[in-house]
């Protein structure tokens, strides 16, 4: 997986946690059998920044833990490629995830587990949204998404 990590925090996200995000998302990509050339980004930010995104794009006037921006590719507005390029393996950008490091800290403390478990939980949660899963559609969809999320994290080794 081609993963861009952007750190917009004031304090900085340490290399260990950036590497953890890379490893967890690479594992999740393999778990979902995504092509190796799948692209996405994760941006770390503070509450002030994610609050602005939450307000602008979701109409919710407060910070949140994670926001996903999926890149929809329905094919209707994509250019037609020459035949010789049709068989080429083109990278597929699935979207962007924004994560509040402030909320990672507070939720990990509140839930009684490690910062690493909460970080993994949030990036996998956002990753699943980028891949079409949506817990807001109903009880069955919520169960499917959260079961898959737990399965990925447990199998990776980030258990509660």
Curated annotation (Swiss-Prot):
InterPro entries: MetalPrtase_cat_dom_sf_prd (IPR023091), YbeY (IPR002036), YbeY_CS (IPR020549). Pfam families: YbeY. Zn(2+) binds at residues 125, 129, 135. One of its GO terms (molecular function) is metalloendopeptidase activity. Its EC number is 3.1.-.-. It comes from the Bacteria. GO terms for biological process: rRNA processing. One of its GO terms (cellular component) is cytoplasm. Its cofactor is Zn(2+). Binds 1 zinc ion. It is found in: Cytoplasm. Keywords: Cytoplasm, Endonuclease, Hydrolase, Metal-binding, Nuclease, Ribosome biogenesis, rRNA processing, Zinc. The keyword Hydrolase applies. NCBIfam families: rRNA maturation RNase YbeY. Single strand-specific metallo-endoribonuclease involved in late-stage 70S ribosome quality control and in maturation of the 3' terminus of the 16S rRNA. Belongs to the endoribonuclease YbeY family. This is Endoribonuclease YbeY. It comes from Leuconostoc mesenteroides subsp. mesenteroides (strain ATCC 8293 / DSM 20343 / BCRC 11652 / CCM 1803 / JCM 6124 / NCDO 523 / NBRC 100496 / NCIMB 8023 / NCTC 12954 / NRRL B-1118 / 37Y). The lineage of its organism: Bacteria, Bacillati, Bacillota, Bacilli, Lactobacillales.
């Amino acid at each position: 997986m081609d993963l861009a990590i952007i750190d917009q925090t004031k304090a900085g996200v340490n290399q260990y946690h950036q590497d953890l995000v890379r490893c967890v998302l690479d594992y999740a990509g393999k778990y979902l059998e995504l092509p190796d050339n799948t692209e996405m980004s994760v941006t770390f930010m503070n509450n002030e920044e994610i609050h602005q995104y939450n307000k602008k794009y979701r109409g919710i006037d407060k910070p949140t833990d994670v926001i996903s921006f999926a890149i929809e590719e329905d094919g209707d507005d994509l250019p037609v490629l020459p035949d010789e390029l049709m068989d080429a393996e083109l990278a597929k950008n699935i979207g962007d995830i924004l994560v509040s490091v402030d909320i990672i800290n507070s939720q990990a403390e509140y839930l009684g587990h490690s910062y690493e478990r909460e970080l993994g939980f949030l990036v996998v949660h956002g990753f699943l949204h980028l891949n079409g899963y949506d817990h807001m559609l109903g009880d069955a969809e919520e169960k499917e998404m959260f079961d898959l999320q737990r399965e990925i994290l447990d199998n990776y080794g980030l258990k509660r």
